[in-house]
């Protein structure tokens, strides 16, 4: 977990920008605030920064972020924070924003479920898909007592699957990634998917097919989990059923269900902001239907939107950049080149050190 403290001592101390959400997009937005010489405060509902990457997939490897041929999710989060941390953004953890109010002077108040109110000159919503919970298999009934010991909806540590007989349910990117990713750790891996074809990335799907051809895994398409067996509070068997009615049983110690998440905008849905496809509609400046209120990342919607990390980082840059005209009206917005800015900061730090 990142070593982050909360330096906020006065909730009424106004900041230039409130960033709602501390996932990759929100963290990078904080860095961009520093680059553009404005203050910010991140408010994150969870107890740590990083969003789903830190909470659900810390050991998952990511391949589609520029400059990183391959990077574990938690390492990407730590790298993003290393960038943002140099500008000392305020960070509020464990508080969910429930309401915002735009005041007569154009500034904003954001209220959290802890009863705290934070003021800023503008707001950037980078809350991902909102609150999320894993999709479950209704035919299995209530299996909460097995969750975290035999049944999992995410891989937080591969050690939980080391030497185990694992049944994975799903056909998307996560299911395919972990089918390949757990090969080195699990005793056996069985992949079950109810459709005829995988929905995940073609490259990973090919790797799964190759592993099947090599006899490293079992793959059952057009098949679903019918029921499970347990003994002394631990999973022992998974019963499978094919689309043609054939049934059989596999021995299993772990059931990894990776069939996606249900997202819920929560209070955001009642904020009188224009919505489309369960997201906030933004213009080319990442502005929502309310002046001074911006959105970036998965929570933002516009024609042709791609919901990937790389897009969110770009949108964070644009949102912060365009928020300057609202935060500092009348001021000329100048281009900021990172190499020049960093050189000036380094020189200033050296001069300050000499003066001591």
Swiss-Prot record:
Quaternary context: Homodimer.
Plastid listed as a keyword: no
PANTHER family documented for this protein: THIOREDOXIN REDUCTASE 1-RELATED-RELATED
InterPro entries with a match to the protein in the record: FAD/NAD-bd_sf, FAD/NAD-binding_dom, Fd--NADP_Rdtase_type_2, Ferredoxin-NADP_redctase_2
Family: Belongs to the ferredoxin--NADP reductase type 2 family.
Protein name: Ferredoxin--NADP reductase
A molecular-function term among this protein's GO annotations: NADP binding
A Pfam short name: Pyr_redox_2
Known cofactor(s): FAD
Cofactor note: Binds 1 FAD per subunit.
Naturally occurring in which organism (per UniProt): Chlorobaculum parvum (strain DSM 263 / NCIMB 8327) (Chlorobium vibrioforme subsp. thiosulfatophilum)
Keywords: FAD, Flavoprotein, NADP, Oxidoreductase
E.C. code: 1.18.1.2
Enzyme class: oxidoreductase
SUPFAM superfamilies: FAD/NAD(P)-binding domain
Record has Flavoprotein as a keyword: yes
Binding site for FAD: 25, 44, 52, 57, 97, 132, 298, 339
Domain of life: Bacteria
Catalysed transformations (reactions): 2 reduced [2Fe-2S]-[ferredoxin] + NADP(+) + H(+) = 2 oxidized [2Fe-2S]-[ferredoxin] + NADPH
């Amino acid at each position: 977990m990142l070593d982050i403290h909360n330096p906020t001592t006065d909730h009424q101390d106004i900041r230039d920008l409130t960033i709602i959400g501390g996932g990759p997009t929100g963290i990078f937005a904080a860095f961009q605030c520093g680059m553009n010489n404005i203050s910010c405060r991140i408010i994150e509902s969870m107890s740590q920064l990083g969003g789903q990457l830190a909470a659900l997939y810390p050991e998952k490897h990511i391949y589609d972020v520029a400059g990183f041929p391959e990077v574990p999710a938690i390492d990407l989060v730590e790298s993003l924070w290393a960038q943002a941390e140099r500008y000392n953004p305020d960070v509020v953890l464990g508080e969910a924003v429930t309401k915002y109010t735009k005041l007569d002077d154009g500034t904003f108040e954001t209220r959290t479920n802890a009863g705290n109110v934070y003021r800023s000159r503008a707001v950037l919503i980078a809350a991902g898909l909102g609150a999320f919970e894993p999709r479950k298999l209704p035919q299995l009934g209530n299996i909460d007592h097995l969750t975290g010991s035999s049944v999992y909806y995410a891989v937080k540590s591969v050690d939980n699957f080391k030497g185990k007989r694992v049944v994975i349910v799903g056909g998307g990117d996560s299911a395919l990634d972990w089918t390949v990713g757990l090969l080195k750790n699990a005793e056996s891996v069985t992949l079950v998917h109810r459709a005829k074809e995988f929905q995940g990335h073609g490259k990973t799907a090919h790797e799964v097919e190759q592993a099947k051809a090599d006899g490293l895994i079992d793959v059952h398409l057009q098949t679903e989990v019918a029921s499970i067996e347990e003994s002394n509070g631990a999973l022992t068997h998974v019963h499978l059923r094919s689309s043609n009615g054939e049934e059989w049983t596999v021995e299993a110690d772990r059931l990894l269900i990776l069939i996606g998440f249900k997202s819920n905008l929560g209070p955001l849905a009642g904020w009188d902001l224009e919505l489309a496809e369960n997201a906030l509609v933004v213009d080319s400046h990442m502005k929502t239907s309310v002046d001074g209120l911006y959105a970036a990342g998965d929570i933002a919607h516009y024609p042709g939107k791609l919901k990937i990390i790389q897009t969110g980082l770009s949108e964070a840059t644009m949102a912060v950049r365009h928020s300057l005209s609202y935060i500092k009206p009348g001021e000329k917005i100048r281009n900021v080149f990172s190499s020049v800015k960093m050189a000036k900061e380094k020189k200033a730090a050296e001069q300050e050190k000499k003066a001591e």
